[in-house]
Swiss-Prot record:
Predominant cellular place of this UniProt entry's protein: cytoplasm
Domain notes: Consists of 3 domains; the N-terminus binds the ribosome, the middle domain has PPIase activity, while the C-terminus has intrinsic chaperone activity on its own.
Domain PPIase FKBP-type intervals: 163-248
Alphabetical UniProt keywords: Cell cycle, Cell division, Chaperone, Cytoplasm, Isomerase, Rotamase
Biological process, per Gene Ontology: 'de novo' cotranslational protein folding; cell division; chaperone-mediated protein folding; protein transport; protein unfolding
PROSITE patterns referenced in this protein's UniProt entry, alphabetically: FKBP_PPIASE (PS50059)
GO CC annotation, single: cytoplasm
Protein name: Trigger factor
Species in which this protein is naturally found: Polaromonas sp. (strain JS666 / ATCC BAA-500)
Function as written in the Swiss-Prot or TrEMBL entry: Involved in protein export. Acts as a chaperone by maintaining the newly synthesized protein in an open conformation. Functions as a peptidyl-prolyl cis-trans isomerase.
Family under the similarity heading: Belongs to the FKBP-type PPIase family. Tig subfamily.
The organism's taxonomic lineage, starting at the top: Bacteria, Pseudomonadati, Pseudomonadota, Betaproteobacteria, Burkholderiales
Pfam families, per the entry: FKBP_C, Trigger_C, Trigger_N
InterPro entries in the cross-refs: PPIase_dom_sf, PPIase_FKBP_dom, Trig_fac, Trigger_fac_C, Trigger_fac_C_sf, Trigger_fac_ribosome-bd_bac, Trigger_fac_ribosome-bd_sf, Trigger_fact/SurA_dom_sf
Length: 436
């Protein structure tokens, strides 16, 4: 087999492969003989179809199949011998005018780039930290109490307040016409908790049982109901019942209802703190990981294989269509989504993937078995039956691959933070959780 490789531009290469025709024909004959032993054709017993008949019926498809296989095998061998790291699939075409007894093919493809990562000791990375405060524990206790609140009807002359549960009838009209979702009876919502539009809640707040009110309401331009978004409606609301919320006391009964065996408030708070610290750890790691990855991209020089970027764009478009389909959008799998929508993000992903792969290769940052085990056990710790969760991960190669990818990213993050100029920044628990 004769092979030549030519550089076309940047990462693009052209490989010319010359194969002896007899190797192709020999394999075609072998496959046709194998096929003849099992093929079924009218007028012949199984396995008794003459070779010339088999060749006439299947010769072209078998020849095409062998050509593809042989060229693919030859390309893989030649690329390996030339130490070419091929990105994507080659575009293969047969050349005309080949010498007698030979087949000549051109394979045009891209190679992965050499990745040059700048001196990481000069890179700057902001590393955030946060603590679980007593206030954060108090807020979680309040959330747990609200989840277990009960309601009791207020006196008839008691106005609706924030935290009350209101039972109402309402009807909305736009230009005198009712609209979908604009009418309901015995509808319940919690006043002041953002379940309804602010103008609606403001109108109901202060109303009493049996009272009716008409008021205008402006739907936001970005309202999820496109038919009413940006329009003004006139609502008629009648309050049928107002109920006050009663929160359970923070005591032994509450603690036991939340699974605390000894029922002490101290044990409840300790359990909440433990869970919050686990969540804080994951969120800090994710945030600091993003900062590290941004720094890596900013401190690396490389050309991007167009084929890799396009493959990532295609994956993202398919993901977007799948998401639209899950939301019930008709013909979502045919939705026209321009490549340019995802190209910048795809380029960033490909760039980051190549940089991380080089960093892992050059510094031995592959995931170790003990790291995989520890990470899975940490993920499983928050579940009622951790060992079942561990077995769930271990029993699926795809899930294990996802765990391995996370562990490698964690290794890279730790490695970079150990090299770079780190600017430590303490933030509040609420800032970390996005509650401010």
């Amino acid at each position: 087999m004769a092979v030549t490789v030519e550089t076309l531009e940047k990462l693009e290469r052209k490989m010319t492969l010359t194969l002896p025709l007899n190797t192709i024909q020999s394999e075609v004959d072998t496959r046709l003989k194998r096929l003849a032993r099992t093929v079924k054709m009218d007028g012949f017993r199984p396995g008794k179809v003459p070779m010339n008949v088999v060749a006439q019926r299947y010769g072209y498809s078998v020849h095409y199949e062998v050509m593809n296989d042989k060229v693919g095998e030859a390309f893989a061998v030649a690329a390996n011998e030339a130490k070419l790291r091929v990105a994507g699939q080659p575009r293969i075409s047969e050349k005309e005018g080949a010498p007698e007894g030979e087949l000549v093919f051109d394979a045009v493809f891209e190679v992965y780039p050499d990745v040059k990562i700048a001196d990481l000791t000069q890179a700057e990375v902001e590393k955030v930290s946060a603590e679980v405060s007593d206030a954060a524990i108090d807020k979680t206790v309040d959330i747990l109490r609200k989840q277990r609140r009960t309601f009791a009807q207020r006196a008839a002359d008691a106005p609706a307040q924030d935290g009350d549960r209101a039972t109402i009838d309402f009807e909305g009209k736009i230009d005198g016409e009712t609209f979908a979702g604009g009418k309901a009876e015995d509808f319940q919502f919690l006043v002041g908790e953002g379940q309804m539009l602010k103008e609606f809640e403001d109108a109901v707040r202060g109303m009493k049982s049996g009272e009716s009110k008409t008021f205008p309401l402006n739907f936001p331009a970005d309202y999820h109901g496109k038919d009413v978004a940006g329009k003004q409606a006139d609502f008629l609301v009648t309050v049928k019942k107002i109920e006050a919320a009663h929160l359970p006391e923070v005591n032994e009964a509450l603690a036991k209802s939340l699974g605390i065996a000894d029922g002490t408030v101290e044990a409840l708070r300790a359990d909440i703190k433990k869970n919050l610290e686990r969540e804080v750890k994951f969120r800090l790691l994710a945030r600091n990981k993003n900062a590290v990855m941004d720094a890596l991209v900013a401190n690396a020089e490389l050309e991007l294989p167009k084929s890799s970027v396009q493959a990532e764009v295609d994956r993202m478009i398919e993901g977007a269509r799948a998401d639209l389909k899950q939301r019930g959008i008709k013909d979502a799998d045919k939705a026209p989504i321009p490549d340019d929508v995802f190209r910048p993000q795809a380029e960033k992903r490909v760039r980051l993937g190549l940089v991380v792969a080089e960093l892992v290769r050059a510094n031995g940052l592959q995931a170790k078995p003990e790291q995989l085990k520890a990470h899975i056990e940490e993920l499983a710790a928050s579940y009622e039956k951790p060992q079942d969760v561990v077995r769930w991960y271990l029993g699926d190669n795809r899930r294990m691959a996802e765990v391995e990818a996370v562990v490698i990213e964690n290794n890279v993050t730790e490695f970079v933070l150990g090299k770079a100029k780190v600017n430590d920044k303490a933030i509040s628990f609420d800032d970390l959780m996005g509650q401010n």
